[in-house]
């Protein structure tokens, strides 16, 4: 049994027949598409004499509803300058997008944000089957922002029921930034307060330490003076009221000895400021040691401050 290429003669003839079949099929499909497009043309449904108001610094947008059947057309925005509509250049502050979550797809022009120079009339257009279709114009009135901006709310497109106020997201974006700043400043303020308290405590302790050092030194001097004075007083105490001092050789060699004891007590407890004891001893003459015996003389004075 002969195959199809054999029946056609050669493989080259079979390839040409296949290409001809694809060409005829594409022509038929194109005619059907054109027929559908003619039955359902593209429509740009912007209401005539549409007007909108905006304030500088707001996030603003205008919408162009587009009706189509099969293929989404290529739509552009332009701004009227006299009798000419100048196409807009896309930038981060001025860009377009499609919103197809509605019953009618919408081609949107975004102002992020809007300025006084954006004041004017805008329209959208498309090229459909070698024919340019223009929409009605939308006029935007841009005014300076004042302090009491709540008296002049943003006006949206009247012919689109689902249009939203573009100034809302800006406040929502500002609130997280302010909250983050507040959460950052609170711990920083608490840390500074804690550091100030620690520095104040260290300063007070240092002052108290300086005040304690002179009193400690005075106590040490008093103790050092009291110990030899008491021991010496006990050593030189008389055995009886009428007895004579038994002076040691060292004390007898001195013509006159004077011992002064100064005591300084704490300011709030003791009233005695100082006490002095003068002890005068007439030394023995070693040459007349056997013939003469001299009695010592001593006296004490006490001063009390009220």
UniProtKB/Swiss-Prot annotation:
SUPFAM superfamilies: Immunoglobulin (SSF48726). Coiled coil: none annotated. GO terms for biological process: adaptive immune response; cell surface receptor signaling pathway; immune response-regulating cell surface receptor signaling pathway; negative regulation of alpha-beta T cell proliferation; negative regulation of B cell proliferation; negative regulation of T cell proliferation. It comes from the Eukaryota. One of its GO terms (cellular component) is external side of plasma membrane. InterPro entries: BTLA, Ig-like_dom, Ig-like_dom_sf, Ig-like_fold, Ig_sub. Keywords: Adaptive immunity, Cell membrane, Disulfide bond, Glycoprotein, Immunity, Immunoglobulin domain, Membrane, Phosphoprotein, Receptor, Signal, Transmembrane, Transmembrane helix. Interacts with tyrosine phosphatases PTPN6/SHP-1 and PTPN11/SHP-2. Interacts with TNFRSF14/HVEM (via cysteine-rich domain 1). PROSITE patterns: IG_LIKE. Its main location: membrane. Expressed in splenic T- and B-cells as well as lymph node tissues but very weakly in somatic tissues. Also expressed in macrophages, NK cells and dendritic cells. A polymorphic tissue distribution between several strains is seen. Disruption phenotype: Mice exhibit no developmental defects in T- or B-cells in thymus or bone marrow, but increased antibody responses and sensitivity to antigen-induced 'experimental autoimmune encephalomyelitis'. T-cells lacking Btla show increased proliferation with a heightened response to anti-CD3 and a slightly greater response to stimulation with anti-IgM. Changing residue 41 to E: In strain: 129/SvEv; requires 2 nucleotide substitutions. Disulfide bonds join 40-69, 64-124, 78-85. It comes from Mus musculus (Mouse). This is B- and T-lymphocyte attenuator. Inhibitory receptor on lymphocytes that negatively regulates antigen receptor signaling via PTPN6/SHP-1 and PTPN11/SHP-2. May interact in cis (on the same cell) or in trans (on other cells) with TNFRSF14. In cis interactions, appears to play an immune regulatory role inhibiting in trans interactions in naive T cells to maintain a resting state. In trans interactions, can predominate during adaptive immune response to provide survival signals to effector T cells. The gene is Btla. Residues 1-29 form the signal peptide. One of its GO terms (molecular function) is signaling receptor activity. Residues 30-183 are extracellular.
């Amino acid at each position: 049994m002969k195959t199809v290429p054999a029946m056609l003669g050669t493989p080259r003839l079979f390839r040409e027949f296949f290409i001809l079949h694809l060409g005829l099929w594409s022509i038929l499909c194109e005619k059907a598409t054109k027929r559908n497009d003619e039955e359902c043309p593209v429509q740009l449904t912007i209401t005539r004499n549409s007007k909108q108001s905006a304030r500088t610094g707001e996030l603003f947008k205008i919408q162009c509803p587009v009706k189509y059947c099969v293929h989404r057309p290529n739509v552009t925005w332009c701004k009227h300058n006299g009798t000419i509509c100048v196409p807009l250049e896309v930038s981060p502050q001025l860009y377009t997008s499609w919103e197809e979550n509605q019953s009618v797809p919408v081609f949107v022009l975004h102002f992020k944000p809007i300025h006084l120079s954006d004041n004017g009339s805008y329209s959208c257009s498309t090229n459909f089957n070698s024919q340019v279709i223009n929409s009605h114009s939308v006029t935007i009135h841009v005014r300076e922002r004042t302090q009491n901006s709540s008296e002049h709310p943003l006006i949206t497109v009247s012919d689109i029921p689902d249009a939203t106020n573009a100034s809302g997201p800006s406040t929502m974006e500002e609130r997280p930034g302010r909250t983050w700043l507040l959460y950052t400043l609170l711990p920083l303020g608490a840390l500074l307060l804690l550091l100030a308290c620690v520095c104040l405590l260290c300063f007070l302790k240092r002052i108290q330490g300086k005040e304690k050092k002179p009193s400690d030194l005075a106590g040490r001097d008093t103790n050092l003076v009291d110990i030899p004075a008491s021991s010496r007083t006990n050593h030189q105490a008389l055995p009886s009221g009428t007895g004579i001092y038994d002076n040691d050789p060292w004390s007898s060699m001195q013509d006159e000895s004077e011992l002064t004891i100064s005591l300084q007590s704490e300011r709030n407890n003791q009233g005695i400021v100082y006490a002095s004891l003068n002890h005068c001893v007439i030394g023995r003459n070693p040459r007349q040691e056997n013939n003469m015996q001299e009695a010592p003389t001593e006296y004490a004075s006490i001063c009390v401050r009220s």
